[in-house]
Structure formats: structure tokens, C-alpha cells
Amino acid sequence: MNSYERVMAALQHKEPDRVPVYPILCGVMRKRTGASYAQWSQDAQTCAEGFLRSVQDFDIDCVVTLIDLSIECDAWGQKLIFPENEAAHPDYSQCVVGDIEEYGKIKKVDFRTSQRMMMHIDVLKRLVKELKGKKPVVAFVFGPLGVLSMLRGQQNLYMDLYDDPDAVRAAVHEVNETLKEYVAAICDTGVDAVMFDTLFASGSIMSKAMWKETEGQAAKELAAVAHEKGVAVMVHNCGQRIYFDAQIEAMNPVAI
């Protein structure tokens, strides 16, 4: 079996020749290309080269394009900081949503105007060209509530969920409408799966009921885009006390 066959067998609950292995080898691979973190995360050719080196040098069984969590928020003009040796992150002193009254600023936008989202799509095209049928290519997408937290700041967002949950949910909807079109374009690159990061679906952040009310329906609609395109859905969640049941109900993933 090659890596693609091995992973597909496991996802279909069949016995592969061995357990598929995927350690997270993303930003660290910039060192194999001689690039800074900033260059690796902003230049499609360099970024793709890093991911390709991960399969060449370590023979991992798939590639997940976790670049950083600030890809999608770029579409709304969030100012970012690109450190030399760590992942990009928002400049929280200049949040797009600076106050609870400003959630109305968040409207559906054209993802094609985002340099970072289009860079990610370029990376995916390069990886699919090189790896299709040999290694599964899995696109990483931050969920709508996570993207909104990049535009507001997590602590402020948490408080806003209590003070004006309707405003937050309305903004989540607008973000999600943008992400739907973005995910459709991602699926059209030929990727094998889309991995959604629904970080907030964990007990260390909020209750299960709050997650369902705030992001659950949006996550369902977003996953449906990939399902309709015939692309597998996966879920990433690095929180604590994760709500596996709620995420499975919403997104029907093949893997978590």
C-alpha cells in the first residue's frame, strides 16, 4: 500500500498494512527550505515546498495544510503580525471588531480579494499536482467562530457571547457565508479532504449548548459544502473536554 491507499483504507474501517501516521509537520518545515516563518506563510511556492519536504524527508502518510490560524481573517482586513520564528497572529491592538457595537461591520466578503486565502488555494493546487493518489492532501480551514475570534479577540468574544449573543451569531453567519464559497473553491483544487477547526466545541471554552447555538448550524452548513462536492470532511479540535458527539452530529466527519 502507498500512503493514499493506507489512509483511505483506514477511513473506510478496513485494515491497512500498518497504522497511518501523521505528526503535525507544518511551520517547522520552513527550516528545510531556509525560509523565515513569515516567508513560508506568505509565499505559495515556499509554503508548498515545505509541505513537500515533509513527505520526502519523513515519509508521513498525508499532508494537512495548517499554515496558521490567521489565513481567513485576512479577508476582512485584519492587521497581522508576522514574527520571524513563530506563526502569524492578529494585531489585537487593532481588531477589526473593536467594540461590541461593531459586529455589524462583519459582512460577507469575496474571499478572492484575500491574498492569504488565495495563497492557500495556490498551495493546495501545487500539492495536489505533486501528491494526488500518492499522499492525501487535506486542506485546513478555521471555523467561522474561530475566524470571528481573530477579528475581535477571544476574551472579548467570550464576554460578548453573554452580553449580545445575537450580534455574535449574526457575524458568525456572515463569516460562514464567505467560508462556504472559499471551501467550494478549495474542493475544486482536487484535495482529498477538508479539515475544519472547530476549536470552540470544547468544555474548556464554552458549554455544548452554547456551541450548538453559536456555531453548530454554521458548521453543519459549511461541512455540507464539502459533502456536496464529494470531498471528505475531517475535524480538528485541540481543546479540552471536546464535544465529539456534537461535532459528529453537525459535520458527519470521516475522522477527528
Regions picked out by a protein language model, each given a short descriptive name:
Residues 65-75, 139-146:
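Short, glycine/charge-rich beta-strand/loop segments that flank catalytic centers
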Residues 68-110, 133-134:
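A contiguous, low-structure linker/loop signature
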Residues 1-29, 35-38, 50, 61, ...:
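Active-site loop segments of alpha/beta catalytic cores
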Residues 37-69:
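Segments that shape or occlude catalytic/ligand-binding pockets
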